């Protein structure tokens, strides 16, 4: 009897552990439609405890966010992370700027690429790594014109029609 209770507790602890690190992927579907994406980078995020809990629950959005350089550091702005209901009495701004964790060589490389006119850094994917930390994939992007977007839609429709045949 006692052994059965111990195995039930162990299995519950294992499932709780796996639920804590379930794969969470929050995508920016607008990015590939609005921009030409070239180079992709991955960086960690500086977050508070309640913010990482909201991200693990899938309550975040990166559709309208962008990255900017300030004082030799890269920051992501306008990224929405919902307030965690059990966070306590300290309210957090859901759209505050968050620092990206990058090495100095990566920051210099990105800064050179972004100096061109019309080039920016756009977040494409927010995910929780197997280590439990939140990571942000972002790309060097150049804006598309309206005729480029229409051409992309036509190509997508043609490929869909060909796959049906």
Explain the meaning of each model-derived region.
Residues 1-21:
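N-terminal amphipathic/basic-hydrophobic helices that include classical n-h-c signal peptides
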Residues 15, 72, 80, 93-95, ...:
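Short, charged/polar low-complexity linear motifs in solvent-exposed/disordered segments
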Residues 18, 48-49, 132:
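Generic detector of short, well-ordered, non-transmembrane alpha-helical segments enriched
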Residues 23-119:
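Ribosome large-subunit tunnel/peptidyl-transferase-proximal elements
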Residues 78, 137-140, 162:
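Alpha-helix boundary/capping detector
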Residues 81, 149-165:
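Flexible glycine-rich active-site/ligand-binding loops centered on an Asp-His dyad
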Residues 88-90, 145-148:
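Short small-residue beta-strand/loop micro-motif enriched in glycine and branched aliphatics
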Residues 103-139, 143-145:
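Beta-rich strand-turn-strand
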């Amino acid at each position: 009897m006692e052994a059965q209770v111990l195995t039930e507790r162990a299995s519950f602890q294992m499932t709780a552990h796996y639920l804590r690190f379930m794969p969470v992927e929050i995508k920016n579907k607008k990015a590939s439609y609005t921009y030409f994406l070239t180079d992709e980078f991955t960086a960690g995020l500086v977050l508070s405890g309640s913010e990482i809990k909201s991200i693990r629950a899938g309550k975040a959005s990166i559709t309208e966010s962008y990255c900017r350089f300030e004082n030799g550091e890269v920051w992501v702005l306008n990224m929405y992370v919902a307030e965690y209901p059990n966070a306590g009495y300290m309210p957090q701004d859901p759209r505050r700027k968050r620092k990206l964790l990058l090495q100095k060589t990566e920051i210099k490389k990105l800064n050179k690429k972004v100096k061109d006119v019309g080039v920016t850094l756009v977040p494409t994917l927010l995910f929780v790594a197997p280590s439990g930390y939140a990571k942000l994939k972002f790309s060097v992007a150049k804006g598309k014109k309206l005729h480029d977007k229409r051409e992309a839609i036509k190509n997508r429709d043609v490929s869909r029609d060909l796959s049906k045949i």
